[in-house]
């Protein structure tokens, strides 16, 4: 699976946004254990600098989370890559993302040609993400809503990616996962979180495994404009 995103020259940028800097990030991710080449290529292609404030552009291709306002962050590239790699293992076509944030995770998945639905509770962040998707020519379906409710009318989903941590997996989201599907989400509180992978088998059984220790912002209820 190869990234389908074809960027205009003005979207690529120069200096710290150059291809050489992106290649170095990909090399670091590979050294850190990311092995799926489709995932690495998507990270290389999607311009992370467009998803953060210009004041932080020089740090866009560091393997670190960065603030995006409203108490939220753009996830560390390794985490984005690990979650993407995990869901690609089930060959999904339709993916739900809970917590659009900057839009970067959705863009990485969208660059792989997947059908993406993403839900964000903070209206201002969602409006900014929509502008970025349009600028990149990406047809990503978005919704301003409480992410804990998912997007049932478009379910079930082959894969679900949750980008904020809850004390336990949210039953409403698990219920929107198709047979043979995979949900990847951070689980835990301020004292410690784990990236958890949940698979719904064809016989209806559920299997879980822990992928890695992580740190995410909390998954909150309600909506903000």
Curated annotation (Swiss-Prot):
Keywords, sorted A to Z: Cytoplasm, Methyltransferase, S-adenosyl-L-methionine, Transferase
Enzyme Commission code: 2.1.1.77
This protein's record includes keyword Methyltransferase: yes
Nucleotide-binding is among the record's keywords: no
Top-level taxon of the source organism: Bacteria
Listed GO biological process terms: methylation; protein modification process; protein repair
Pfam families, sorted: PCMT (PF01135)
Function: Catalyzes the methyl esterification of L-isoaspartyl residues in peptides and proteins that result from spontaneous decomposition of normal L-aspartyl and L-asparaginyl residues. It plays a role in the repair and/or degradation of damaged proteins.
NCBIfam families recorded: pimt (TIGR00080), PRK00312.1 (NF001453)
Protein name: Protein-L-isoaspartate O-methyltransferase
Native species: Stenotrophomonas maltophilia (strain K279a)
Name of the coding gene: pcm
């Amino acid at each position: 699976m190869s990234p389908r995103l074809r960027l205009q020259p003005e979207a690529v940028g120069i200096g710290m946004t150059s291809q050489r800097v992106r290649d170095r990030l990909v090399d670091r991710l590979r050294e850190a254990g990311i092995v799926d080449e489709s995932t690495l290529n998507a990270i290389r292609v999607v311009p992370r600098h467009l998803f953060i404030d210009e004041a932080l552009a020089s740090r866009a291709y560091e393997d670190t989370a960065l603030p995006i306002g409203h108490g939220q962050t753009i996830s560390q590239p390794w985490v984005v890559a690990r979650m993407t790699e995990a869901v690609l293992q089930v060959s999904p076509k339709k993916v739900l993302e809970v917590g659009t944030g900057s839009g970067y995770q959705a863009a990485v998945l969208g660059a792989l040609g997947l059908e993406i639905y993403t839900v964000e509770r903070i209206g201002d962040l969602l409006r900014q993400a929509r502008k970025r998707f349009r600028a990149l020519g990406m047809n990503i379906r978005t919704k301003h809503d409480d992410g804990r409710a998912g997007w049932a009318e478009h379910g079930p989903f082959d894969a679900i990616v949750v980008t904020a941590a809850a004390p336990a997996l949210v039953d409403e989201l698990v219920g929107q996962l198709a047979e043979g599907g995979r949900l990847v989400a951070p689980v835990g509180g301020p004292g410690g979180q784990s990236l958890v992978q949940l698979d719904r088998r064809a016989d209806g059984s559920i299997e879980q495994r822990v992928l890695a220790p992580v740190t995410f912002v909390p998954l909150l209820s309600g909506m903000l404009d």
